[in-house]
């Protein structure tokens, strides 16, 4: 059903990914077939597959370059859903996770920074979060943030006085902007790879993900599974 669509120019958007109208149509069919978000718990409308089940399904769905996003198993949403389900409070899951699982919004992980900030080494992150009157004030710069231009929900990693801390914010909040969409070689994920500037973004403490100072551990948990799922998908190519 999906693989033949790769043969038609009309299936692609200008960034060489599946166009949104076609994607939405296929996603409805995937949901009707009961194969939507298979990596999520049954209690959150998934199939409850563990790593072994995921490996078999992810390999097969990536026989097509369109496959993972059609099943809601593509990066960065895949890893973001995993860590929100594992770390988030129930209130955070309802607000930030469920809309991603349902396919209502996309998400992004804002971690990587230009030099001298944290690139491959998150411990070098310079983006700063300062606590004041129940809110965290964010200032700094990120780049190569996958999917940012199409995302509504963001996980942000910033430096606090006790180490690194993870936060959640919505695209409509003031105090941040996408400076540019960075060109890359080959097809792009929906939302591209973007440079982001934070200038006084305010995040209430209720939208902190996990404990203060535990952000590095949180993203390593998230990235650990993401590295495995990338391999699962690549085997299918």
Where are the predicted features?
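Glycine-rich beta->alpha junctions and the first turn(s) of the following alpha-helix
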Residues: 177-237
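A short, Trp-centered hydrophobic/proline-enriched beta-strand micro-motif
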Residues: 103-113
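Hydrophobic, small-residue-rich alpha-helical packing segments that form membrane-like cores
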Residues: 116-125, 131-136, 145-147, 159, ...
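A short core secondary-structure module
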Residues: 141-179
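Flexible, glycine-rich active-site loops centered on histidine and acidic residues
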Residues: 81-87, 109
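Short glycine/proline-enriched turns and hinge-like loops at secondary-structure junctions
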Residues: 49-51, 120-123, 147-152, 189-190, ...
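Amphipathic, small/basic residue-rich leader segments at the start of a protein or domain
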Residues: 1-75, 86, 91-95, 99-102, ...
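Glycine-rich phosphate/pyrophosphate-binding beta-alpha loops
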Residues: 116, 143-149, 187, 225-229
């Amino acid at each position: 059903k999906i693989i033949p669509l790769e043969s038609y120019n009309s299936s692609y958007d200008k960034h060489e990914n599946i166009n949104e109208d076609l994607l939405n149509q296929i996603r409805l069919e995937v949901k009707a077939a009961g194969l939507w978000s298979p990596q999520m718990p049954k209690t959150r409308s998934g199939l409850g597959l563990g790593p072994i089940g995921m490996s078999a399904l992810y390999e097969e769905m990536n026989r097509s370059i369109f496959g993972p996003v059609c099943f809601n198993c593509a990066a960065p949403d895949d890893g973001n859903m995993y860590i929100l389900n594992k770390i988030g409070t129930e209130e955070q899951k309802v607000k930030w996770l469920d809309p991603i699982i349902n396919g209502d919004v996309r998400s992004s992980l804002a971690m990587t920074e230009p030099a001298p900030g944290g690139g491959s080494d998150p411990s070098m992150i310079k983006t700063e979060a300062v606590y004041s009157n129940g809110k965290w004030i964010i200032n700094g710069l990120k780049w190569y943030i996958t999917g940012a231009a199409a995302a509504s929900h963001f996980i942000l990693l910033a430096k606090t006085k006790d180490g690194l801390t993870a936060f959640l914010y919505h695209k409509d909040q003031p105090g941040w902007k996408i400076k540019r969409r960075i060109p890359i070689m080959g097809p792009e994920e929906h939302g591209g790879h973007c440079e982001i500037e934070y200038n006084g973004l305010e995040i209430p403490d209720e939208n902190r993900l996990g404990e203060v100072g535990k952000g590095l551990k949180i993203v390593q948990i998230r990235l650990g599974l993401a590295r495995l799922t990338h391999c699962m998908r690549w085997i299918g190519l």
